[in-house]
From Swiss-Prot:
The lineage of its organism: Bacteria, Bacillati, Actinomycetota, Actinomycetes, Kitasatosporales. GO terms for cellular component: cytosol. Belongs to the thiolase-like superfamily. Beta-ketoacyl-ACP synthases family. This is Putative polyketide beta-ketoacyl synthase 1. It comes from Streptomyces coelicolor (strain ATCC BAA-471 / A3(2) / M145). SMART domains: PKS_KS (SM00825). SUPFAM superfamilies: Thiolase-like (SSF53901). Its EC number is 2.3.1.-. Keywords: Acyltransferase, Transferase.
Length: 423
């Protein structure tokens, strides 16, 4: 079967420090961080009391009270990001065949925030097991189930083709775009809204990561807490947000006169069958994902101009990822800039993969590599070029974005400049 070429024609982003792609790119290109003390609830009892929050008010972005009540925060993020992406693509969904349009969105924790809130209501703050269901909000089931993420976006834009929610932990955003890529490339749809959303800054989610000491306890210096690849790194900073890309059959995009940012040229995902949170030091599974994505893109590792790292800022992840990139790219790894935007916008779990892909598309559009903020002290086991603290101009033709998720998920996406230059 001939695989169709898949174009990226629109981007929408809701991220800490930057709602909308102009603000998001400004934050990244300036190397600023969005981490601060948690304001969404009182974090005093937590080990890690900091996060990268979105300055988000639903009504500021065209979401009415009914939508805000019906949808959890993460779905609100996705609706705003999808609307921006569709506008950016200059795509009139009313003129598209709804059966030839899809929506594939990812999330790691779904509506945990709303579920936690309602449990407090119905159980009188956890004091009773015979819960009072009269206290529950009428939209609770729709608000917390992960399926709502994709169905709400599909409903908003009249999408009647394949609609699916992907939940593969912290690779959900990459995998959602990867699955959408296959749907377009294989001719099942002509256009697909693809991305992810999560709003995990809630007491129970923060406590979960506190329990395994995965998050940074640098509460006295939030701006410098996330330090991917730095020798003094001590965990990630929780984030939140959403990003949606419009993926289209390249010929379909050309026929309607759309501007094209770039193409999705390769995708792969593998599991490590090893440990829920542990990673093999050698990085074999991530390297296999990279190699397979490169094969699909018909590229050698030496063609990659920039690697967007998972770069969570935990000791084991950053060593594992460095080893994987060196295994796949060989000596070229040492000449390839590799940075982590989690140093600036935190780790939004399932959403971060799509947010990072949006950053990659913008990096290609501007021909600028975003930096790794807060990188000051080299780690002998992490010995690549992590673009410390300042953005860097560079010719970007092919970009690799990689992700790693609890549960052993390892994914990679390759983006390539489209013929005729970039948007």
């Amino acid at each position: 079967m001939t695989r169709r070429r898949v174009a990226v024609t629109g981007i929408g982003v809701v991220a800490p420090g930057g709602i909308g792609t102009p603000q998001f790119w400004r934050l990244l290109s300036e190397g600023r961080t969005a981490t601060r003390r948690i304001s969404l609830f009182d974090p005093s009892g937590l080990r890690s009391q900091i996060a990268a929050e979105c300055d988000f008010e639903p009504s500021d972005h065209g979401l009415g009270l009914a939508t805000a009540q019906r949808c959890d925060r993460y779905v609100q993020f996705a609706l705003v990001a999808a609307s921006e992406a569709v506008r950016d693509a200059n795509l009139d969904m009313n003129r598209e065949d709804p059966w030839r349009a899809g929506a594939t969105l990812g999330t790691a924790v779904g509506g945990t925030t709303r579920l936690e809130h309602d449990y407090v209501l119905v159980s009188e703050r956890g004091s009773r097991w015979d819960v009072d269901d009269r206290r529950s909000e009428p939209h609770l089931e729709r608000a917390f189930t992960p399926a709502t993420l994709s169905s709400a976006v599909a409903e908003e834009f009249g999408v009647r083709g394949p609609v699916q929610t992907v939940s593969t932990g912290c690779t959900s955003g990459l995998d959602a775009v990867g699955y959408a890529y296959h749907a377009v490339a294989e001719g099942r749809v002509d256009v697909c809204l693809a991305g992810a959303a999560d709003s995990p800054i809630s007491p129970i989610t923060m406590a979960c990561f506190d329990a395994i000491k995965a998050t940074s306890p640098n509460n006295d210096d939030p701006a410098h807490a996330s330090r991917p690849f730095d020798a003094d790194r001590n965990g990630f900073v929780m984030g939140e947000g959403a990003a949606v890309l419009v993926l289209e059959d390249l010929e379909h995009a050309r026929a309607r006169g759309a501007d094209v940012y770039c193409e999705v040229s390769g995708y792969a995902t593998f599991g490590n069958a090893y440990h829920m949170t542990g990673l093999t030091k050698e990085g074999l599974e991530m390297a296999r994902a990279i190699d397979t994505a490169l094969d699909m893109a018909e590229l050698d590792g030496s063609a990659i101009d920039y690697v967007n790292a998972h770069g969570s800022g935990t000791q084991q992840n950053d060593r594992h990822e460095t080893a994987a990139v060196k295994r796949s790219l060989g000596e070229h790894a040492y000449a390839t800039p590799m940075s982590s935007i989690k140093s600036m916008v935190g780790h939004s779990l399932g959403a971060i993969g799509s947010i990072e892909l949006a950053a990659c598309v913008l990096a290609m559009a501007h021909q600028v590599v975003p930096p790794t903020a807060n990188y000051t002290t080299p780690d002998p086991e992490c010995d690549l070029d992590y673009v410390p603290r300042e953005a860097r101009e560079r010719t970007l033709r092919h970009v690799l974005s990689v992700g790693s998720g609890f549960g052993g998920f390892q994914s990679a996406v390759v983006l390539s400049g489209s013929e005729g230059g970039l948007r």
